[in-house]
Amino acid sequence: NVRIIINSNIDLAYEYELDGVHLNSKQLHELSHFPKDLLVGASCHSENDLKVAEEKNADFAVLGSVKKTLTHPDLEPMGWVRFSKLVNKSNLPIYSIGGMTNSDILSSLEYGGIGIASQRAIWAI
């Protein structure tokens, strides 16, 4: 029972009959509506992003950057306390992202997330 969610490309999700798509924050704000027959996740970086994702009926959100990350080296991380405050204002299931490693899974859960999203930590296994 594995679900495959592709990053940012709705057309490929349909072409390869994938389960869903993870939208970047630009797509979150630009799309007038989300596909109803795909799981849809949204990258969020603020309370407003989470509100938009919820209003457009996203299935989940990915919130960060929680920690310093190589992907966005100039971005000031929000930290776990801010992450928790934003999670508590939303009804969406939320994954933490940004500098996450396997050792952050428990922290994400403790601060209200449902898990982590990561690129480098997964490929490093």
Regions found by a protein language model. Give the residues of each.
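Structural motif
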Residues: 16, 56, 89, 110-112
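Histidine/lysine/aspartate-rich catalytic loop segments that bind and position anionic ligands
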Residues: 40-43, 47-69
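Glycine-rich phosphate-binding active-site loops on the catalytic face of alpha/beta enzymes
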Residues: 24-33, 62-74, 99-125
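Generic hydrophobic/aromatic pocket-lining and core-packing "Φ" positions
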Residues: 10, 50, 83, 105-106
